[in-house]
Design a protein with these regions (language model features):
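Well-ordered, non-membrane alpha-helical segments in soluble/globular domains
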Residues: 52-65, 97-131, 162-186, 210-219, ...
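N-terminal Sec signal peptide cleavage junction
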Residues: 18-19
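N-terminal catalytic cores of secreted or lumenal carbohydrate-active enzymes
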Residues: 26-174
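Bacterial N-terminal signal peptides
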Residues: 7-15
Length: 361
């Protein structure tokens, strides 16, 4: 997530027209079968991360317990992603001096499926919630990050006895295909009952080094039955070109939360209008600065996102992604500060209501 630099009203659900799936008359993208309604970003894979996505951390994103003790389904999509390994190497351009090699790509693919963490923890949590409220209407979806083969890299490693050179687009594409195959192989070997692998997320948030390879990479994963996801940051190179780049699903990052000086009142409506014009979905963003104890307290900005998305018609009709910093949904839930707990309840109820639009309990 590049740092720089919701209340329901009945609104016509076709205000936004996003072309990622065929829809029946009267459907909105939020209710369209095969779409992820609410996808939470779960950063994991670098040693610098404090969150391990254990059972309790995952449960806060799987289900919400209301004031009456009743459970409700929360997020229906889980995006596991990482930008760097925390040891000086990066999975995308610009984050570290050195790019990750094949060995780091392998470590990343494997870490999302270890026992008791990430996908395995989600599987356990969903089992527990199912035992109380039954099966969700929509099987929970997993999206896994796809590292960027960074141009100029010579030390990535070998495939089929050949040293790959990332000045060569064919070698970059082959590395991506290998990683896709590896993730699919590991995911299938785990035999999850509650999770489906929906597709892969292109970790480069700008198109600068991507234009010459993403068509072929996307075609390959689609040939295997998976979707290609992208979440470019606001103003990035190519951030409105997702259809031309052949991504299947694209969310626009507003980046409103991250400015040191709060943007004016027309900022978020402008982002919403851009997303509408380009047929993109939208992302909600907040991090540890939504905690009341943070000296740079910004919880009001989370409210601004939801207000803007409600006013433009996105809140009850459009799939959303959620950038939550390290593990902010759980942090708000377990905080000793009532103001944080209230913010968690308010936020969780918005997600629950959106899931209820999709037919969930």
């Amino acid at each position: 997530m590049k740092k720089i630099l919701l209340i329901f009203l009945i609104i016509p659900v076709l205000i936004f027209s996003c072309g990622t799936s065929d829809r029946r008359p009267g459907d909105s993208p939020l209710t369209t079968e095969g779409n992820i309604g609410d996808m939470v970003l779960m950063y994991y894979g670098g040693v610098h991360r404090k969150t391990t996505w254990n059972h309790d951390q995952c449960m806060s994103s799987v289900a919400y317990e209301d004031a009456h003790g009743k459970l409700h389904w929360m997020f229906d999509g889980f995006l596991f992603l990482e930008f760097k390994n925390g040891k000086g190497r990066a999975y995308a351009s610009y984050y570290e001096p050195l790019p990750c090699r094949k060995v780091e790509w392998e470590e990343l693919a494997q870490c999302y499926f270890v026992d008791g963490r990430a996908c395995s923890a989600l599987e356990e949590c969903i089992d527990e919630v199912k035992a109380q409220i039954g099966e969700p209407k929509h099987k929970r979806q997993v999206v896994v990050t796809l590292p960027e083969p960074i141009p100029g890299q010579k030390d990535w490693g070998q495939l089929n006895g050949k040293d790959l050179d990332f000045d060569n687009d064919e070698d970059r594409i082959e590395a991506c295909k290998w990683y896709i195959d590896e993730v699919i192989r590991i995911f299938k070997s785990r035999n999850y009952k509650n999770l489906e692998l929906a597709g892969f997320y292109w970790v480069a948030e700008e198109a600068t080094h991507s234009r010459t390879i993403v068509h072929q990479v996307g075609d390959y994963m689609r040939s295997l039955g998976y979707k290609f996801y992208w979440i470019p940051y606001w103003g990035s190179d190519g951030h409105g070109e997702w259809k031309e780049l052949k991504f299947d699903v694209a969310y626009q990052q507003p980046n409103y939360f991250f400015y040191q000086q709060k943007p004016d009142s027309v900022y978020l409506p402008k982002v919403c209008e851009f997303a509408k014009e380009r047929g993109m979905y939208l992302e909600v963003e907040f991090d540890e600065r939504a905690l009341r104890s943070n000296p740079d307290y910004r919880a009001d900005r989370l409210h601004d996102y939801m207000d803007a998305f409600q006013k433009c018609g996105a809140l009850d009709s459009l799939p959303l992604a959620y950038y939550i910093g390290d593990c902010m949904v759980n942090d708000l839930k377990v905080s000793s500060c009532k103001e944080d707990n209230d913010l968690y309840d308010w936020f969780a109820n918005i997600v629950v209501k959106r899931q209820q639009i999709r037919g969930e309990k």
